Swiss-Prot record:
GO terms for biological process: protein glycosylation; S-layer organization. This is Probable low-salt glycan biosynthesis flippase Agl15. It is a multi-pass membrane protein. One of its GO terms (cellular component) is plasma membrane. Its main location: membrane. It comes from Haloferax volcanii (strain ATCC 29605 / DSM 3757 / JCM 8879 / NBRC 14742 / NCIMB 2012 / VKM B-1768 / DS2).
């Protein structure tokens, strides 16, 4: 598998999908307002939380075992049987607590939550199989199709007069399309399941689920707690800020998704030197976009939240800055965390995750009650910093982690210069409209890219990967 080419292919697809999703969220936020957006985000948060026991880490286990190339069909069949048990229990629980769930969400959406968990788990299992088959690049089109369905369907339904339910209906439609497309793509055939394969999956998933808990807690626990203590408008503003900063992680996530199956394969062959090389060479590209994004958001946070989404979203301007800074840590964590799991060390990843999850939960309750949604952002950043340090410590016990400090430093200097230029643009020209904001962002990107490419090692790596992307 060509790591650079797969990463860039996935990144390009993610850019398109994220751009489409950003336009969708912008339209929905302007049409529905922060409160209705909050209802939808709470639905997604609850879906993310119930997905933890519904999956129990099996998707990660399937990707790991299939990537090893031994009895993939048997592992897939065993995984399907294992997943039926927790999914059935989750659906039963949703039925029992339907009224309470509807009250929390602010509408009669519990039945759609049950349907969503079924569709999501089956669709994501198909995606995990593709990744395990070392066909990560092919998952790019699945993400695009899912987002096109959500945005397109949501646009039509919102335009017809529906509120938050429009976004939920289109979300379900996107899952259906992803499932159908994914099933048509995978080449692994179902074989007779076995207790041995099921036990192997469980032995991996019992640790992988803890890392999954960390991921879901990181993505949704702050939103869920905000929904308990604050208003749906706060939920809508906070999660919108989160979605903006998530765009900066697109390339980092593409790189991390690509290296996992490859590192897993090398690990099974004890090719440590290649593993160390790919980890070192992946960290800098992973940070390439998040560093300038933080400095750009530092200058334009009020304008992004107010001009793009509306004045009621400006309550999350400081949240936007804090979460953008946190993404710098996440860009390192996604590489280190996925590498640790690929080395078949889910237990250590689980240990780090448990510590950070407990810290995240405690800090969120304390800081949200004290500082509102800004406290939620601080809690997330602090707990994730601890998580990253612990993962790095555990990974360093098996392989050498080398940071390319000169390249990272050059990106930081380039970002500082860009921020100075943007501040001058904001002061002299002013940013009072979408056009002015987009011009400022484009100008900042141009300045950063130009200065960054002046550094020869970065320039040579960028051009080499660009050439590898183009088929000959």
């Amino acid at each position: 598998m060509d790591l650079a080419r797969s990463s860039i292919k996935l990144f390009i697809a993610n850019i398109f999908g994220a751009g489409l999703q950003f336009l969708g969220i912008t339209f929905f936020a302007r049409e529905l307002g922060a409160s209705q957006m909050g209802v939808f985000f709470l639905f997604q948060a609850l879906l993310g939380i119930v997905a933890i026991p519904a999956d129990f880490g099996l998707r990660g286990a399937v990707e790991k075992r299939i990537s090893e190339g031994i009895q993939p069909g048997e592992y897939l069949s065993s995984a399907i049987i294992l997943k039926l048990i927790p999914i059935s229990l989750i659906i039963l629980s949703i039925v029992v607590f339907e009224q309470r769930i509807n009250g929390y969400l602010g509408g009669d959406f519990a039945v759609y939550l049950a349907l969503a968990i079924i569709l999501q788990e089956t669709a994501q299992l198909a995606v995990s199989v593709l990744k395990g088959e070392l066909r990560v690049g092919e998952t790019a089109e699945l993400n695009i199709i899912r987002r096109i369905t959500w945005v397109g369907g949501g646009f039509l339904l919102v335009s017809s007069g529906l509120d938050a339910e429009a976004l939920i209906y289109s979300l379900l439609a996107g899952m259906v399309v992803t499932l159908a497309w994914g099933l048509s793509k995978i080449s692994t055939s179902l074989k007779k399941p076995s207790f041995k394969n099921a036990r192997s999956l469980f032995n991996y998933s019992k640790y992988s689920v803890v890392s999954s808990i960390g991921g879901y807690f990181y993505s949704w626990m702050d939103v869920a707690i905000i929904g308990i203590f604050l208003t749906q408008s706060h939920v809508g503003a906070y999660e919108t800020a989160w979605r903006v900063t998530a765009i900066t992680m697109l390339f980092s996530q593409a790189v991390a998704s690509t290296i996992f199956p490859q590192v897993s394969q090398w690990s099974s062959k004890n090719e440590q030197q290649q593993i160390e090389s790919v980890i070192s060479n992946s960290i800098t590209p992973s940070m390439l976009l998040v560093i300038p994004a933080f400095f750009g958001i530092l200058v334009f946070s009020d304008e992004i939240m107010g001009i793009v989404f509306g004045s009621e979203f400006t309550i999350a301007s400081y949240v936007l800055i804090i979460l953008a800074g946190e993404k710098i840590l996440q860009s390192v964590h996604v590489i280190i965390g996925r590498s640790l799991q690929a080395l078949n060390q889910p237990g250590l990843a689980a240990r780090a995750t448990v510590i950070s999850v407990v810290l995240n939960l405690i800090l969120n309750v304390i800081l949200i009650l004290s500082f509102g949604i800004v406290g939620a952002a601080v809690a997330t950043a602090l707990s994730f910093a601890v998580n990253t340090v612990l993962h790095a410590h555990y990974l360093s016990s098996f392989v050498s982690i080398k940071f390319q400090y000169s390249q990272i430093g050059w990106c930081t200097v380039s970002s500082l210069i860009m921020a100075g230029v943007l501040f001058g643009f904001k002061t002299l020209v002013g940013v009072n409209s979408l056009i002015q904001l987009f011009i400022g962002i484009f100008f900042g990107m141009l300045v950063y890219t130009t200065i960054t490419l002046l550094y020869q090692p970065i320039r040579e790596t960028a051009f080499k990967n660009l050439i590898r992307l183009v088929p000959i």
